[in-house]
Amino acid sequence: FVGDVFGAPLAAEGVLAFFLESTFLGILLFGRHRVSSRVRVAAAFIVAFGATFSGFWIVVANSWMQTPAGYEIQGDKAVLTDFLAAVFNPSTMPRYVHTIAASLAAAAFLMTGISAWYVRKGRSLDVAARGVRLGLIVAVVASGLMFLTGDFSAKQVAETQPEKFAAMQ
């Protein structure tokens, strides 16, 4: 019924983000003795960008299911009428920023934990101590952003889906 609309963000994720990630992940993993360290660092950043971009399209698809926009019913199926309205529906950006903040917080806590383990074992103390400090700073900032965007998302749900908001309470 909604394949023409719902398929668009999934196709964008597959074509744009997934291939970007997989190509540069291959360079990152298998290019150690084949490409320079600068190329490998660039590949790592491109993989991170690709994963973030992939997450955007996945959130777009989920957000469209929650607050559909940019389509109309024609006969027995939904037809995409405004791609940008479907992509940037009322819940896309709050959900996406919340997801990115949560991902950063999780990664920062992981980095902090691994760095703290190195400090405890007395290995690579210089790098490990910087890892603990940076990890904690990013974790605190990302967690604060996560709380703010979570509140904003809840207000958006209350506005666009009052029944769902009532069930959340």
Feature map (PLM): residue ranges:
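Polytopic transmembrane helical bundles with strong interfacial aromatic enrichment
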Residues: F1-Q169
